[in-house]
């Protein structure tokens, strides 16, 4: 029989691996640019920037995400029913009760963030509270608590911040390269062949790095959603509640105003809507590999089908 939070240790390792890969990638890009530009200052800047970014991401990434989402902390008196649902599920799951935030937005959605279960946050939109019944809301909260129990909230939040850093640095280095190469052409008639190769490599890296960063972000997001769906259903012992909630959230035509591309993968369902219910399975099959790779969430009908195929009676 499946048990809760079997992905916890794996996600701890993935978090440290992510930080290590990020750190080494920035140093590699910085080294290539330093060689191409004949300036060691670029490498020093890359090292310092990656260390500071990793530190900030670990300790304050949740606050950054909450600020970006316009989420506001609420007290027990402001929504007693929501607090009781969260507290009851936390007791069942053996988790500390997270802080609860509300996003004033009519689009139904939710996410969890924080560096560990002791510093976790669950954020839900006002639209979610208005449009779901109790069993559906319990399913959504159980899904978010499963992200907390599996300790993948830090992984997901770090990805949000670090992908933004990679994109920012890549753009900065690319602009620096064009400026520096133009200035060197003015000072000399030519450079070494190796330096020219490194310059081309630097430009290619600055273009490809953000693409690979986004692909990694989306891949992590899709995998963690399936795991949280399964664990959420185990927690409530009622997969149909979460399945119905996902159908309602997906079919709702309103986009989430506070969402952006950096935080989209954190939500239980993509916050960007096209004013249509979730696409058919046939429609998803017609999508190309790259289109599917760029999806922040698994196809909704696959998630719903997986939930309705679960047996949690034992």
Go through the PLM ranges and name each one:
Residues 25-34:
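Membrane-embedded alpha-helical segments in integral membrane proteins
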Residues 160, 203-207:
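Hydrophobic alpha-helical transmembrane segments of integral membrane proteins
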């Amino acid at each position: 029989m499946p048990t809760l939070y079997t992905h916890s240790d794996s996600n701890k390792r993935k978090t440290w691996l992510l930080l290590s890969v990020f750190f080494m990638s920035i140093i590699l890009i910085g080294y290539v640019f330093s060689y191409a530009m004949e300036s060691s200052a670029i490498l020093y800047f890359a090292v310092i920037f990656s260390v500071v970014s990793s530190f900030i991401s670990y300790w304050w990434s949740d606050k950054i995400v909450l600020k970006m989402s316009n989420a506001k902390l609420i007290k027990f008196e402001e929504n007693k029913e929501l607090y009781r649902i969260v507290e009851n599920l936390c007791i069942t799951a053996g988790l500390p009760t997270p802080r609860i935030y509300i996003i004033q937005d009519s689009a139904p959605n939710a996410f969890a963030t924080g560096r560990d279960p002791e510093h976790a946050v669950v954020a839900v939109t006002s639209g979610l509270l208005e449009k779901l019944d109790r069993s559906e809301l319990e399913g959504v909260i159980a899904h978010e608590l499963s992200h907390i129990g599996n300790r993948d909230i830090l992984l997901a939040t770090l990805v949000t911040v670090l992908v933004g850093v990679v994109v920012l640095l890549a753009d900065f280095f690319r602009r620096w390269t064009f400026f520096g190469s133009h200035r060197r052409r003015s000072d000399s008639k030519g450079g070494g062949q190796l330096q020219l190769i490194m310059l081309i490599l630097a430009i290619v890296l600055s273009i490809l790095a953000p693409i690979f960063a986004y692909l990694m972000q989306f891949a992590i997001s899709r995998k963690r959603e399936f795991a949280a769906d399964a664990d959420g259903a185990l927690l409530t012992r009622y997969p149909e509640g979460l399945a119905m909630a996902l159908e309602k959230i997906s079919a709702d035509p309103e986009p989430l105003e506070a969402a952006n591309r950096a935080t989209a993968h954190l939500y239980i369902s993509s916050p960007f809507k096209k004013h249509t219910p979730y696409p058919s399975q046939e429609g998803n099959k017609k999508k190309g590999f790259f289109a599917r790779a760029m999806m922040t969430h698994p196809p909704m009908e696959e998630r719903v089908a997986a939930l309705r195929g679960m047996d949690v009676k034992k």
